[in-house]
Every structure is written in structure tokens, then in C-alpha cells.
């Protein structure tokens, strides 16, 4: 199995692995990651004994032995995208994904040969999924699990992953698919 993580930039442009845009749910502090410096974030996470690693820490830990799927949560500036590419330059097996297609477009403009995936929410129609799959900057799709039962998946000529599988029964039923799962 590989590792999927969400990434954000702090106020001082450090790339961190964290799911939420805000610290409220995990730390009961109403601050957005983009508005806080990494040293302040580090202090909060250490005080609460809930570490927030830098992307670079995850990369070192993975030692190029695990596939890393890195989801860019907010819209990154072009400077932050370039910094991200610098951090992943020595990785052999990774992909960059986002719900925000502008991140994928901008990454593709910077470097054409990246493994870029577009995340597709459950609100999309299947026709819209097909349309997005034809974009040259999209190398693969990450579809919400509702699309697992879609009969016309074969029409998509790119690799497909499915998120977020939290149910063992569903995992076992579709384990021949590319599933992104959590807490199983």
C-alpha cells in the first residue's frame, strides 16, 4: 500500500501534512494554516501532543519505499507549487492531486511530465467526469466512492482511484479497484 496525505502551506511557505484548512477541529484553535507560521504551528502541535509533520519529514520517512499520493488542499501560489516540486524532486514514486483543477493546470505548465490527478467530488455527473478525464493535464482521476458502481467506467481511458473507503465490507467488495481507504 501507499500513503495518501493532504498538504497545505503555512504563512511562511512551509509545506505541512494536515487534513483541515483550520486548526479548530483537531486543536480547538480557530486559525487557518495559511495564516500561521510553521514555528507557531509546531509549538501548538507539540503542546497538544498531536504532531503536524512537514512534507519533507514524510518524504524522509518513506525512504522512497512507499508510493506517496499528495493532495494539494488549497490553491497554491505558483511559488508554492515550485517549492513543492523542489521537495519531491528526488521521489521516485509519487503523484500530486487536487480538487482545485487550477493547481493541476499550473503544475502541468511548470513541468509536463508530472503524475497529476484530479479529485472528483460526488456532486459531479458522470458526463462531467468523462469531460474532465479528457484534459491533457489530468493523468488520472480520483473519484468519490459513489462512482464505484458506475457502469460506464470503461469509457475513461485513464487510471482511476476511488476515495475514501471507510467501510470494510465496501473495501472487500471492491478490493480489485484502486481504493484509497482510511481507518480500516
Predicted stretch roles:
Residues 1, 38, 94, 161-163:
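Sequence-level detector for tyrosine residue identity
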Residues 2, 15, 33, 95-96, ...:
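A residue-level structural signature of the nucleotidyltransferase/glycosyltransferase Rossmann-like core
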Residues 4-23:
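Glycine-rich, proline-tolerant flexible connector loops at the mouths of alpha/beta enzymes
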Residues 8, 43-52, 117-184:
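C-terminal active-site rim and adjoining tail of enzyme catalytic domains
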Residues 15, 80, 106, 128, ...:
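Short acidic, gly/pro-rich beta-turn/loop elements at beta-sheet edges
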Residues 16, 108-109, 153-154:
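Short amphipathic alpha-helical segments
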Residues 19-123, 136-139, 143-146:
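Metal-dependent phosphodiesterase/phospholipase catalytic core, i.e.
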Amino acid at each position: 500500500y501507499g500513503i495518501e496525505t493532504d498538504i497545505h502551506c503555512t504563512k511562511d511557505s512551509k509545506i505541512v501534512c494536515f487534513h483541515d484548512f483550520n486548526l479548530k477541529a483537531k486543536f480547538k484553535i480557530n486559525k487557518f494554516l495559511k495564516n500561521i507560521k510553521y514555528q507557531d504551528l509546531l509549538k501548538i502541535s507539540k503542546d497538544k501532543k498531536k504532531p503536524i509533520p512537514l512534507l519533507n519529514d514524510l518524504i524522509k520517512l518513506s525512504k522512497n519505499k512507499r508510493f506517496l499520493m499528495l493532495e494539494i488542499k488549497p490553491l497554491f501560489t505558483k511559488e508554492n507549487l515550485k517549492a513543492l516540486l523542489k521537495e519531491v524532486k528526488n521521489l521516485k514514486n509519487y503523484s500530486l492531486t487536487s480538487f482545485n483543477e487550477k493547481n493541476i493546470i499550473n503544475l502541468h505548465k511548470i513541468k509536463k511530465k508530472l503524475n497529476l490527478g484530479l479529485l472528483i467530488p460526488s456532486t459531479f455527473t458522470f458526463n462531467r467526469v468523462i469531460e474532465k478525464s479528457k484534459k491533457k493535464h489530468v493523468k488520472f482521476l480520483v473519484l468519490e466512492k459513489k462512482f464505484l458502481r458506475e457502469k460506464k467506467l470503461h469509457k475513461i481511458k485513464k487510471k482511476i482511484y476511488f476515495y475514501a473507503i471507510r467501510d470494510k465490507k465496501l473495501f472487500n467488495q471492491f478490493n480489485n479497484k484502486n481504493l484509497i481507504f482510511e481507518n480500516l
